[in-house]
Amino acid sequence: PMDFIIGGQKNIGRGWQMLVSCLGAGRGISLPALGVSTSQVAFKSASEYAAVREQFGLAIGQFEGIQEKLADIAGKTYLQEAMRVLTTEGLGMGLKPSVVTAIAKYHMTELGRDVLDSAMDIQAGKAIQNGPQNTLASGYVAQPIAITVEGANILTRNLMIFGQGVMRCHPYLQSMVESIHSEDKGADKEFNGILRKTIGYSTANSLRAFRLGVLPFTASANSALPEVREYEKAVHKLSAKLAVYADFSLLVLGGKLKQAEMLSARLGDVMSFLYAAMASIKYYEQKVASSEREQAAPYFHYATRFAL
């Protein structure tokens, strides 16, 4: 029957479009939530184990090697929670940020894998013995599923994050491509206007990056919190440099940028970690109560420095 088709007759042949549309939002909810929940469980399990397990008459949590792993777990778990909150807030506002959800899916599942590996290292022999007392093994076995589904992570990093992001986020690039393929009489005039704007935009990016490179103290910061201001300045300086590298890559490679997967992936990494740093800053400013900031500060500093 026709009413078995989602949306009825007018949606015949649009199944793939509907699926991709749902994927863009869905991968920003389920898999990032799985990544951060995995990290939270691993953090709790590893820290409790480090407190009760003894070696040479001392709790293993007193050894610096274990402390280093626990600090890494704690900082990355904070960063994941900050990214989860920022991403879902955007989705809750009705936005469909497909590039942002790709960033969240890739980096939060990878961070979840890193955290779980560190927790397994801490629990050592206990972590590799299956049974009801093993709180990590089932998550360790299931983690490759999160890495694979809704866009395998290799594909997401190499093709989707920057390959799609540069087209969607550039203020003029998409309009320029549309004008090139347009058959309207005024398409040439429109293209010339967009080209002038693009050149002006790239020139402004280059001058801004040069100014911040030579005079780094001129970087702006809006936060009232002194511990946040230096990170805001670092984000502004790095974003200016990324804009120049992205423009230069587009100028040299053009449409072949997607085929230069290693370059696209590295540029995507920079963009992704800038997003992670902004998420960490926003979470610390807006979600952490003033009375709790002193306790949260070590997590915030570790997570933001890791992202930058």
Regions picked out by a protein language model, each given a short descriptive name:
Residues 1-308:
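Flavin-dependent oxidoreductase catalytic core characteristic
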